[in-house]
Amino acid sequence: MMKKSILAFLLLTSSAAALAAPQVITVSRFEVGKDKWAFNREEVMLTCRPGNALYVINPSTLVQYPLNDIAQKEVASGKTNAQPISVIQIDDPNNPGEKMSLAPFIERAEKLC
């Protein structure tokens, strides 16, 4: 009986840990569309961390970039190590001096929260 209780407890705690783990998806320029793609990479990963902190991750280097204010505050406070999103964000060819919109990526990442 004790072994079954311990096994049940371990299964519950491991499944709870899996649920608490941040979700990560990969999105590509092909999938999003060249006209909306905001990055200098062919694909990036998006994730939502506890507290709704959204990040873009470079799949080649695993460097992360804050996507919203919550994530930027985590980086500023030293809670998370990341580079500025401007490092991988491209210029908007239709609006000189402006960067491509991050809105489609923020929207996709929010669905992971």
From Swiss-Prot:
Signal sequence coordinates: 1-20
GO cellular component assignments: outer membrane-bounded periplasmic space
Keyword Signal: yes
One Pfam family it belongs to: DUF2511
Protein name in the entry: Uncharacterized protein YebY
Cross-referenced InterPro entries: YebY (IPR019648)
GO biological process terms, semicolon-separated: copper ion homeostasis
Keywords noted in UniProt: Signal
Keyword Membrane: no
